[in-house]
Amino acid sequence: MSQTAIIIWIVVIIILLVLGGLGAYFFYSRYRHRKNIPPTPINPPSSITPIQPINPPSSITPIQPSGPPSGGNHPIPASCPAYQLVNNKAITLVPLPADTSNVKNAQDCQNLCTQNPDCYFYNYVGLFDGCSLMQGTVDNNVMTGFAIRGSEDGCPKWARYNTSIQGFNTGNPSNVESEEKCQQLCQQNSSCDWYTYDIGKKTCTLNKAIDFNTSTLGIKMPH
């Protein structure tokens, strides 16, 4: 090989080495640049709106009852009698404790019932001046209504108490959905002196007082 050819090859090799070095430097510089640039973080939203719970109303309005049946316990006008009197009728129950030794007539017996807040009705037997103050079995799930016969306009048609009173059963109608319906059934039955309606069991019982000569049944009108 001539000297000229050798020189040319040497120059070519030098040029290739220079180009290779420049290329290597170029790629190395890009690599360092990329490595030194921190990655761009994915920022969360400035504020996350939390899901608001659905709050219940501050107060729940209870279902209001429709009120007592017609002729219920309303304020009684002063012109209305304080008692419903039924002659020759009696209810046989265990009487309330009371001193009846001074009772001489039906009015005395009535006065004792008036003075006793637990007395709902009384029996006075004129044959031997017997006076019994009665209440029945108090039960908030039971409503007893006494029919007030011949009451004047504006005066109660029924005397209603949360008590159970046994009498002569004149009917046990089934599927009675309300006290008002039980009251209507008693009103339609001429033998019914009072009804007893069990609110929980939805049972209606129509009752009749016993016939008893010289006896007066006095039913206190609730205020």
UniProtKB/Swiss-Prot annotation:
Primary location: secreted
KW Secreted (keyword) present: yes
Protein name: Putative PAN domain-containing protein R486
Annotated compartments: Secreted; Virion
InterPro entries listed in its UniProt record: Pan_app
Signal sequence extent: 1-23
Lineage: Viruses, Varidnaviria, Bamfordvirae, Nucleocytoviricota, Megaviricetes
Cysteine pairs bridged by disulfides in the record: C80-C155, C109-C131, C182-C204
Entry keywords, A to Z: Disulfide bond, Glycoprotein, Repeat, Secreted, Signal, Virion
Location of the PAN domain: 80-155, 159-223
Pfam families for the chain: PAN_1
Residues bearing glycans: N162, N189, N213
Transmembrane segments: none
Annotated source species: Acanthamoeba polyphaga mimivirus (APMV)
Annotated Gene Ontology cellular component terms: extracellular region; virion component
Gene3D superfamilies cross-referenced by the UniProt entry: Hepatocyte Growth Factor
Domain of life the protein comes from: Viruses
Region (Disordered): 39-73
